[in-house]
Amino acid sequence: MNPPISVFFLTSEVLPVVKTGGLADVSAALPAALSELADEEIDIRVGTVAFRGVESLPGFSLTKTFVARTPAGALTIRIFEGRLGKGNVPVYAVDPEGLFDRHGLYGEDGGEYSDNLERFSLWNHALLHLPAVVGYSPDIIHANDWQTALSIPLFPHVIRPKIQTKPHRSVISIHNMAFQGVYPLSQWHWTGLPPAYNSFDGLEFHGRLSLLKGGIQFADLVTTVSPGYREEVLSEPGGCGLSGALSHRQDRFVGLLNGIDDREWDPASDPFLAVHFSGSNPDPKDLLKERMRKEWGFSQGRRRPLFGVVSRMAHQKGLDLLAETLLSMGEKGDLGGEWVVLGSGDLHLEGLWRTLQALFPDQIHLRIGFDEPLAHRIIGAADFLVVPSVYEPCGLTQMYGMRYGTLPVVNPTGGLRDTVADGKTGIWMEELSENGIKNAIFKARTLYLEGHEIKEMRIRAMAVDSSWKNRAREYIRVYRRLMETPPWHNPLE
């Protein structure tokens, strides 16, 4: 048995407290998977925001109140505690005087709250006081994205001297380089960091401050969510202005694939599916397709592939180019098959897809919004799942598709390239363009109509182990190597 290890996992989103994207899924699944490794003794605890309504969540209750000194002075901090997964992972939802009691987590109506630097900085200060309050001394602080990146320089140089905890290591995981927490230097005081950190070797970023840069500069280890994305962000434009900082940390920068919750996403037991199937018995999947086609009013009698899209409607996801491609294909009378689309986001894109549905009502069915049961049903019923992302740090949808024998049709960027094998478990687009998307759609249709090969590919895709249990072992190995490695040298010392 390896020696025990303790990890304080910091995240702005975790199910069931709050979710705006995939970070919430990762933050729930990875700690749970780590805690359930039978041959490892790991004390992992999650620190997150006390989002509106947390006190009403089953299993969550107010357990502690304390006062923390912050850049805003003395704040009264409330801790709502709950549990995750079979391992009963403690989750601390931290409330710095109601700063997250709002309709949105980051903003409303497509805009960001003007006081986000204040909110997230004060929350980071409160989070880092929490271990001493609950009697917890972590070996590793694992931050995620810009929202918790401030904790990396803050803990050793501001908080630890006050609470005198043991030496620790720090990790910053980057889920998407496009979101960096960039704010005016005039708001620097909210960080609580010494003036020396307001420099090129610190958080200064083109005349502003970048919270994510601070995490990159001072963490003992930087990770991102796939090996392919790691390579892309080491140069521009993938690095979004921070490729230099990442290149400086290359020897302490690794790509670790995300996983999926293979209990929640299991076609053999999924409660949202009317019929269940598996790799050893895949045929009932066809019944789900026919149910969906009838339910959504597709014309009966023709044998055509069903393409699914389950995505945020954003330029990053390539939904604008896909819509333009389908418009062009539709004008020539051939969409390649039938389409079921679920998503929401950019209002212009939502309008574009509504226009497409109006033009081709017999071939495209659209649902605007977030609907978890419907997402399961589409992925269970479709023949192909189209993922035309401009860039994709890791992506989860394609792994859900493979788990359900729904072959991903992807632009091979970042984690899509790492997880989908062209011609074996999915189809790669030759390029991200109208022609590239159209050719991949027609290739998928040919595969479907020929019949034999698609069955083999489905079974092969369903056999791929993308579970968090499998991925968690990689994280354990990284954590243990990190504890054996000297701390990263602070460039400001």
In which residue ranges do the predicted regions lie?
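Catalytic cores of nucleotide-sugar-dependent glycosyltransferases that transfer UDP/GDP/TDP-activated
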Residues: 1-493
